Amino acid sequence: MDVQKWYLRTSKLALALAIIRSKPADKSSREYTEHLAMLLSEEQSKWRSKVEILEAEVMQLRQKLLVSRLCSGSFKSGYVSSQLEAQEPKSSESTLTSMEDSGCDLSNEQRTESSDLSQHFVESCTPTHFPPLPLVKRPCAILQNPLSSHMQFLQYLLELKNLTESGNLKRDLTHFEKDSSTVSDSVFQLLDGLITFYRNPKLPFSRFWTEAVGTLASLISDYNLSSHILKKCSKKLEEFEKTLLHAILGNNHINQFQVQHYVSQSLVTLGNCSLLRKSIISLLLSEVNGFADDLGAINQEQASYDVSRYENIFYLFWVLEQLLQKETEEGNTSSIGHDDQEIKKFLQKHDETIFQLSDAFPLFTFYLWRVGILLSSAQIETLRK
């Protein structure tokens, strides 16, 4: 017998004997074992919570240290610090959406709950002046809004970047490799929180989430910061893009059009970053191509189809149009990548799909035609260049 297996069996036997000998008289061995397991699980949960609190404090200390180094190393004149302190905090307060699209009115109880929720976000999401970065001293502060400190730090970093014209920020981030990892770690944790929220987005929709997506897009759009962020967070960004896509397609609730609007707008905001736009366009076209194939099979067999998915696909068309128009406006049509497999498949089957589905699904084929025009125009513009 293997030595490791022998030790494992011996340990299990010793543990079983210890439980049998120490169990109370009014409990069976199984009941006592389950009781001990529950106590151990509770203890592990407590330690896990303590570790999370300590990790959050360490992260905030790292953020504060990075900002202090940047300010002391690059802005000794005090100009930037005074400028930042003179600025009002960025608006991350919660703005509750009205329910005009739902056709429903809010009861007094719901209005009270909405008011309480609004007050909660105003207190927990509005970034304070930076520095100093407040340390988390209570577990409830983390549980209420674990993302607010990351938002505050990243927004402050963008303010530093915007006020710096000499390029000192780039030199500092290159010099302090460990400090640059602080930015990546903050982005990673912010993405984790965003993914958790967008997996099941609900009204009222706080402005905090849309601002968080905008902050991410701005950070990744920055040439000096993007390399550090993408190096660690590329997989997490892909997961976030897919989460937004699934949040749109998987929404089958009645009168939840505002959720669709906000999630779609978040996807557009993320796609405004040129470094992410190509992957988002490819992801959207992949879904459109797959849905067109499904509709083709349904049309031939005269079978039923998922009405919710059919309605939701038009939000993807809207996002696609916004991103393709943005690409054309910026003159970056060559970056769309017509060698992309999903773009190739879309253009190759475009006319045939419209011809086959135009009678049964006229609205779908109309939007298919619109996206095809935008892609073809971008392709012609690329060939001209």
Curated annotation (Swiss-Prot):
Required for DNA double-strand breaks (DSBs) formation in unsynapsed regions during meiotic recombination. Probably acts by forming a complex with IHO1 and REC114, which activates DSBs formation in unsynapsed regions, an essential step to ensure completion of synapsis. Residues 86-110 are annotated as: Disordered. GO terms for biological process: DNA recombination; homologous chromosome pairing at meiosis; meiotic DNA double-strand break formation; oogenesis; spermatogenesis. Belongs to the MEI4L family. Part of the MCD recombinosome complex, at least composed of IHO1, REC114 and MEI4. Forms a complex with REC114; the interaction is required for MEI4 stability. Interacts (via N-terminal domain) with REC114 (via C-terminal domain). Interacts with IHO1. Residues 1-126 are annotated as: Interaction with REC114. InterPro entries: MEI4. It comes from Homo sapiens (Human). Residues 92-107 have a biased composition (Polar residues). The keyword Metal-binding does not apply. One of its GO terms (cellular component) is chromosome. It is found in: Chromosome. PANTHER family: MEIOSIS-SPECIFIC PROTEIN MEI4. This is Meiosis-specific protein MEI4. Keywords: Chromosome, DNA recombination, Meiosis. It holds the Pfam family Mei4. The keyword Membrane does not apply. It comes from the Eukaryota.
